[in-house]
Amino acid sequence: MQTKDGHLPKNLGDKVLLVAASHTGNNIFCTPAIRFLKKHYPNTIFDLVALNQKSAEVFYGNNDVSTLFITDKKHKLTKLAKNYSTVICLYYKSVDVVSGIEKNLASVPPLVSGVHHADQVLNFVADYTGHELTEVDRAYVIGNGSTTNSSPIANADIGNDDILICMHLGCARTAIHGWKFFYRHKTMHQKLWPIDSYIELANQLIRANSRIRFVITGTRHEAFLGKRFEKSVPGTINLIGKTSIPELFKLMRDMNLFISQDCGVLHVASASGVPLLGLFGPTNPANTGPYPMKKNHIAIKKESMAAINPTEVVAAALRLLDDFPKTRVLESLGSH
């Protein structure tokens, strides 16, 4: 088989080691490229290194990956790489941990603005291997890595007519550092929408439609945000600290809408097909927005997060709920 320019595709060998990133979103950006590699090299073993435990959850149950390793130690990765014919670093900031590898190493270059990060990784592996991309290749892949078949809200008291909106209130920094980071740096962190704005948004939506209920997610370090939201918004289902990435993916299938700022869970939602409303300040949705952009996705972009008005978000949310209604099957949630 020849490539479109008449050359033979690159021979990767029998075993390839892929090196991903340390953040959930950046690892999700790698998944279309991994699927592309497995599609074109079905007999090659692709093992993968994620740099920490939480971001590794992206790859749980991913059938394109044979073995998942978790380490950010350069010496361990250098030793591991000796067992592989090719090593491909899928995230440019992970290049430091692969710098000890002396041969058969390829790495995604620094990312540029104006092109989605997932597309840049995908374009790199397509060019590197010599295989042609199609539109079908532009899709995230999140595996069924959940240990249970039930929904994360299976035991919640949910009515037949409830409209469920999932919101993720934090970001990568609050997920790791919790309230100390939030209260010391909340005015400096450019990706965060103020918690008071989320609360105002929620209560405006409930006033617009009393059937609306909110499901909030996050890591255990973000429990302080959940308590504040739950206290101010009646009927909230608080799942903060209770879900893995595969469970979040499963949760999205039960939601009518997902709303958040630019964060890893936004990309989980993007992979799931749920109607999605993303809030962007200085970060560019062309780089890190929903992927690929669909009719049931809206990205609100302002110069700063503080410039995003809850009333504008309410209007966009109600439009998505009207345009993409969902019929919930309560069997999967538990009947009440």
Which residues are covered by each model-predicted region?
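Catalytic machinery of carbohydrate-active enzymes
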Residues: 1-336
